[in-house]
Amino acid sequence: MSVTNVTCKIGDKEIKFETGKLALQAPGAVVVTSGETNVLVTTVANETVREGIDFFPLTVDVEERMYAAGKIPGGFFRREGRQTEKAILACRLIDRPLRPSFKEGFRCETQIIATVLSVDNENEYDVLALNAASLGLQLAGVPLDSPIGAVRMSLINDNWVPQASNTELEDSVFDMVIAGNLNEKGEVDIVMVEAGASDNAFEKIDAGSKAPSEELVADGIDSSKQFISELIAAQAELVSKNDVPVTDWPLVEDFSKELKSDIEDSYKSEVENITSITDRKERSNKQSELEEKVVEKYINEEEDNTKAIKLAFKSLVKNVVRDRVISLSLIHI
């Protein structure tokens, strides 16, 4: 396997993706570099589904090592300590946009491990690892609806700066990590926004910096789409340079399309009424009553399809709530 790499420029930062050099036994292995920060991300997925499993067993782990900073662990045993809060948050950051991006029905056990090889205290590794994880899954041939691109946007001196260094972040008022994918039109859809103000944001605003108004934040999100598109394009370029394994991945169907369609035709209006109830307890009780009613109507005692009925009903509720959020920009939960 030859070493291949792709470099893209996000703002004034270069991000390099490389594969074919480390962790060659892993189906998907990517080293992502920005400055002197290097992260190895490996992805592995079983080709079979564990019997009886009713969820997607995705594991994301971030391994920080003292050698990445050129240090030896302290303490008597000279061993690495427990996972830091930063590493835990990085795991969640990687998991959130990727988990819903897998093909519907994909239940094969999947593992993503990001190992921090080196840090330069200027370029954070979390967003880099997220992009590399998306690329690693593609190299492993794991079925995704769309690759994920992610970028950190920081409000510095009243301007949105992508992938700001830690030195630049000292002047930041507001920061966002934005992840997106490509829709059928080839346009970027935002799938995750994680945002927060800096520790001394109020002091900076009092000193004359712009506050992160709704319009300003919307501009930042809109600006991120260009960078997300470039990152996804860089991933696609590296994938095209490698032989991706073709695997017939098994997809699990929790319920038939006919069952869901019948339930939707018969009960969608009732679900819409129930989800509009503002009292949480009353809404929950009404939903449980309707679920029992649906189960009684469609149950097949010979096949024991109760679980499939409940999952189909749950899917209907989920879709109705989602449509309500999008159409009304409102949710009472």
Q: What do these predicted regions represent?
A:
Residues 1-46, 50, 147, 247-331:
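Extended amphipathic alpha-helical scaffolds
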Residues 54-61, 129-132, 310:
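Conserved glycine-bearing catalytic or ligand-binding loops at nucleotide- and phosphate-handling centers
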